[in-house]
Amino acid sequence: MNYWRRTLGARESTVEAFEGYLKRFEQPTQEGFVVCLRDTAAIVGGVNINNIARGSLQSGTLGYTAYASTTGRGYMTEGLWLVIRHAFVELGLHRLEANIQPDNITSLNLVTRLGFQREGYSAAFQFINGEWRDHERWAITAEMADIAAQPTNQDQPR
């Protein structure tokens, strides 16, 4: 999960405004989701699965962003869990990875709550806002999430 240190702006507060965001996921290696409130359909954030690899890997990398005004209410916990479930059940993935800056306590708490395990540290991992940033690498598998995906024959290595 590459958590971008940016909050969503008012211009991105409708589904229509997210069309550009969603269009970039119209390829087999990426999927994008908008996290909305159930009652009002107000957008509270977005989640994406990038670098989807098939064959013997069956994996992807998560990214997300949220409105600062909606943090601490469990919306991203629920939204991210739904995307994780979708990745394991609907997409048949086996593993999801999250890369998080070490000082991003909110994001670290989120993945810990969802059952991710810390796997390592990547120095100068991603170029953000003019600087190379270190990241911690976290991951979860379908078994760890107790959502076992059943691969189809077409998903198996040849």
Predicted regions mapped to residue ranges:
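Conserved GNAT-fold acetyl-CoA-binding loop/helix
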Residues: M1-G20
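Acyl-donor (CoA/ACP) binding surface of acyl/acetyltransferases
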Residues: G32-R158
